[in-house]
Swiss-Prot record:
This is Malate dehydrogenase. Belongs to the LDH/MDH superfamily. Substrate binds at residues 88, 94, 126, 157. The gene is mdh. InterPro entries: L-lactate/malate_DH, Lactate/malate_DH_C, Lactate/malate_DH_N, Lactate_DH/Glyco_Ohase_4_C, Malate_DH_type3, NAD(P)-bd_dom_sf. It comes from Thermoplasma volcanium (strain ATCC 51530 / DSM 4299 / JCM 9571 / NBRC 15438 / GSS1). NAD(+) binds at residues 10-15, 34, 101, 124-126. The active site is at 181 (proton acceptor). Its EC number is 1.1.1.37. Catalyzes the reversible oxidation of malate to oxaloacetate.
Length: 325
């Protein structure tokens, strides 16, 4: 049986880490792309040379897109992971990256449209939900085949902080985060539990509030430690979980940025935009979107997140008017 093909656009810390995780989990041949000459080739070779110890028999190869014709090597990809873009620095929000990253996403989108429009696409470049929207608008790819990182990573952080506070295994913590992948994300307390026991029965409100706040600013906490660059290990494995569910058709339910339309638009109060909600991920991409009910106070938080995503998506529309693709 032919191996799957996974292309990773961007060979920085996140892209290279994703490539390594994809290889070690033997999800398919990995094609690594970057605009800087030598970086994707060197990192791909480095990952390939670790194969004897990890035991993976697959190809990891790199291509520099300073020669744009090298994008043709992503043709026929089962999954494309888009990590290309500027990294956050201390004091920056994900939204501050918009101007730089939308230009990069525009170039990537046109090449996806040209060489591999039928791939499932995972958008990681920040702000991920907004860049997913830009990519879909420019590439014309079926939005069901596009999902953005956000809730997968934010939920992993939320679960980690809860597990550490309670001194329990992370495997027994069920919790998720919805909304935009920014400071207005919504960690959902009411659906959070440990082995089925509601979090609110295990922790006092002030502890929960502190964990929610830390989750919202979890990425910034790491940026402040690193000074230059942002998180990549937790994003890398969060992305890999999404890709694995596509490649193996696992039907995992993971909160991710998905395109909201139809009956879901009426429920969530946002239409034809990407925002983080619980979705089922399989070989066809976003195979189902789950509507969750809100209590009044939860709805207010959700509406704030929606407003933030709507405003940033409008920036994409305005940018596209000035820069027709």
């Amino acid at each position: 049986m032919a191996r799957k093909k996974i292309s990773v656009i961007g060979a920085g810390n996140v892209g290279a880490t994703v490539a390594q995780f994809l290889a070690t989990k033997e999800l398919g041949d990995v094609y690594l792309f970057d605009v800087v000459d030598g970086i994707p080739e060197g990192k791909a070779l480095d990952i390939q040379e670790g194969a004897p110890h990890w035991g993976y028999d697959l190809d990891v190869v790199g291509f520099s897109t300073s020669d744009s014709s090298n994008y043709k090597n992503m043709e026929g990809s089962d999954v494309i992971v888009v990590t290309a873009g500027m990294a956050r620095k201390p004091g920056m929000s994900r939204e501050d990256l918009f101007d730089k990253n939308v230009e990069i996403i525009a170039d990537v989108s046109k090449n996806i449209k040209k060489y591999s429009p039928d791939s499932i696409i995972v958008v990681v470049s920040n702000p991920a939900d907004i860049m997913a929207y830009a990519l879909q608008k420019i590439s014309g790819v079926d939005p069901q085949r596009i999902m953005g990182l956000g809730g997968s990573l934010d939920s992993s952080r939320f679960r980690t902080f809860l597990a550490k506070e309670l001194d329990v295994s992370v495997e027994d913590v069920n919790a998720f985060v919805i909304g935009g992948h920014g400071d207005d994300m919504v960690p959902f307390i009411r659906y959070s539990s440990v082995a089925g026991i509601p979090i609110e029965k295990l922790l006092p409100k002030e502890k929960i509030d502190a964990i929610v706040k830390r989750t919202r600013f979890g990425g910034g906490e790491i940026v402040n430690y690193l000074k230059a660059g942002s998180a990549y290990y937790a994003p890398g494995i969060s992305i890999t979980a999404m890709v694995e569910s596509v490649i193996k058709d696992k039907k995992r339910v993971i909160p991710c940025a998905a395109y909201i339309t139809g009956k879901h638009a009426e429920h969530y109060g946002i239409n034809n935009k990407f925002i983080g909600v619980p979705i089922k991920i399989g070989e066809r991409g976003v195979e189902e979107i789950y509507d969750i009910d809100f209590l009044p106070e939860e709805l207010e938080l959700w509406k704030k997140s929606v407003a933030s995503v709507e405003a940033s998506s409008k920036n994409v529309d305005e940018w596209l008017k000035k820069h027709p693709q």
